[in-house]
A protein has these predicted regions:
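Extreme N-terminal starter segment of soluble prokaryotic enzymes
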Residues: 5-7
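Conserved active-site tyrosine of GNAT-family acetyltransferases
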Residues: 56, 136, 141
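Conserved acetyl-CoA-binding loop-helix of GNAT-fold acetyltransferases
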Residues: 100-113, 134-138
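Conserved GNAT acetyl-CoA-binding A-motif
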Residues: 115-127
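Surface-exposed loop and edge beta-strand positions of immunoglobulin-like domains
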Residues: 9-11, 125
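Acetyl-CoA-dependent GNAT
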Residues: 13-14, 21-90, 95-96, 108-110, ...
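Active-site acidic-Proline motif in GNAT/NAT acetyltransferases
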Residues: 95-101, 128
């Protein structure tokens, strides 16, 4: 469990510059190898962020788009959706200073608890080189297929007595 207490709140219009910078930070290592000038990298990442944000809003309209805060400071984002047949972890990202402090694990534990209460499996997509892949595997997620550059992972809901009786 995290020794860093966090709170979640709904994404607001004023958070857009923060989540765009968070997105750029999450791709900094990848972009360092591009050989592009800084201005080109910034323009590319801005375009990619806008495309991702538009896609998420259109395809996950009923999702919870949350800002992760610690002592009033924005430190990340968590996008999740609880559907009728499955919970989705759409995106989770933390600023580097708050990574590897147990926050991601605590948020996954909370997601699992909520999904388990609803008897829902959880699905997510992750790139194979993303360090979070190991975290997801520790939490019982298994690769179910590969779509493009992403691994699709799933964690089954635990068996409940009601389900076992059927």
């Amino acid at each position: 469990m995290s020794n860093c207490a966090v709170t979640l709140r709904a994404l607001q219009t004023g958070d857009m510059p923060f989540i765009e910078q968070l997105y750029a930070t999450s791709r900094a290592q990848e972009m360092a190898h591009s050989g592009w000038p800084a201005e080109q990298v910034a323009a590319f990442l801005s375009m990619q962020f806008n495309a991702q944000h538009t896609y998420y809003q259109a395809h996950f309209a009923r999702a919870e788009f949350l800002i992760i805060e610690h002592q009033g400071l924005r430190i990340g984002r968590l996008y999740r959706h609880f559907g009728e047949t499955c919970a989705l972890l759409i995106d989770i990202a933390l600023i580097p200073a708050f990574q590897k402090r147990g926050i991601g694990s605590a948020l996954l534990e909370d997601l699992q608890r909520q999904a388990d209460e609803r008897e829902l499996p959880i699905e997510l997509s992750v790139e194979p080189y993303n360090p979070a892949l190991q975290l997801y595997q520790r939490f019982g997620f298994k690769v179910i297929n590969q779509a493009g550059v992403y691994l699709r992972m799933r964690r089954e809901a635990p068996n409940h007595p009601r389900r076992m009786a059927q």
